[in-house]
Structure formats: C-alpha cells, structure tokens
C-alpha cells in the first residue's frame, strides 16, 4: 500500500487574493514569502490595489476571489456583487478621524452642535474649506458625517478626491484644510 500523495506534491491550487498596501495584507505576503501557501497546496497570487473600490472594479473580471478590504467597499460589494464578509481582521473605527493642522480655526470651536458636545468646528469655520479624501472610503463616510453634524453638505466645501497616498502627500505639502 502506497501513502497518499501530499497536497504539496500535487499542482498547487491558484488562489487569487486582493490586497491593499497596508498592514492587513502583510499576512498574505508573509505566508507566500515563507512558502506556507505551497505547504497547504495553494499558490497565492496577490493582486494589489490602491483602494477598496479599485478592488471591486476588478471583481467582475474575476481577478480575485478572496482578500481584505475596507468597510465601505464591503458594503458596496455586497450590494453590487453579492459578496460576503467572512471575518473582521481588526476594528479600525478609532483611527477614522477628520484631520486638521494645528492652526485650523475649527479647533477653536467646540460643542457648536449640542448633540455632539466634543465635536470641533462650526459651519463658519468649515464652510468653503478644502477636504482631501478618497471617494467611497471610510474616510469619505466620516467626512460626510462630520459635515452633516455641522449642518453642512459636500456642496458647502471644496472636495478633492485622491488616492490615499496622494491625500497624505498633499496634506503633508500644505494642500487642503481637512
């Protein structure tokens, strides 16, 4: 009687994974670097995208079958493509914030909206200002909720849509107010 061949001896099953250049993707990359995918009879094909919405745009072309993405793309994916959330890697809700520079006038007004006594800013300190954001991201959602709490909409401010890395670079270069 011969032993059954191991999974590694067979041709590995190609598994297309979507990822973004952030810490959640490290586990896929590290597993591939260590050969752990091959040990389990898999061949990870990691496809990197700048945003979760970019990942979703690649879904109809079947460029990936599993991966990690953000909250807003998960919801959009479920609505548009019947995708499933199978697990939450970590809760990043506490890091989603509206960011300003130390000299921003919004920092001088606290509690303008009594429903949010710790919220900084007022319609007068925010209206007409420039917001850097990534379309359909948790950042975009948080910014919209911030404006709503101040009785404003996206039409009351200047919206500059950019990829996440561009948002950081632009803000660091002094572009934008929020």
Tell where the protein language model's regions lie, with residue ranges.
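Short, low-complexity disordered leader/linker segments with a strong preference
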Residues: 1-13
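Pocket-lining segment of extracytoplasmic ligand-binding domains
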Residues: 166-178
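Short, glycine-/small- and polar/acidic-enriched structural segments
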Residues: 10-154, 158-161, 177-178
């Amino acid at each position: 009687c011969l032993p059954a061949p191991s999974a590694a001896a067979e041709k590995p099953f190609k598994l297309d994974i979507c990822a973004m250049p952030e810490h959640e993707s490290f586990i896929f990359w590290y597993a591939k670097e260590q050969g752990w995918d091959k040990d389990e009879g898999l061949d990870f094909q990691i496809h990197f995208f700048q945003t979760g919405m970019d990942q979703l745009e690649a879904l109809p072309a079947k460029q990936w079958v599993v991966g990690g993405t953000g909250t807003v793309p998960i919801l959009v994916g479920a609505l548009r493509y019947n995708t499933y959330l199978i697990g939450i890697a970590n809760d990043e809700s506490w890091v989603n914030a509206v960011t300003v520079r130390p000299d921003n006038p919004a920092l001088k007004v606290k509690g303008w909206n009594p429903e949010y006594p710790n919220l900084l800013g007022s319609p007068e300190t925010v209206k007409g200002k420039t917001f850097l954001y990534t379309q359909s991201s948790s950042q975009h959602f948080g910014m919209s909720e911030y404006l709503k709490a101040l009785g404003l909409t996206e039409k009351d401010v200047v919206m500059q849509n950019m990829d996440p890395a561009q948002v950081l670079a632009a803000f660091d270069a002094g572009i934008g107010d929020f």
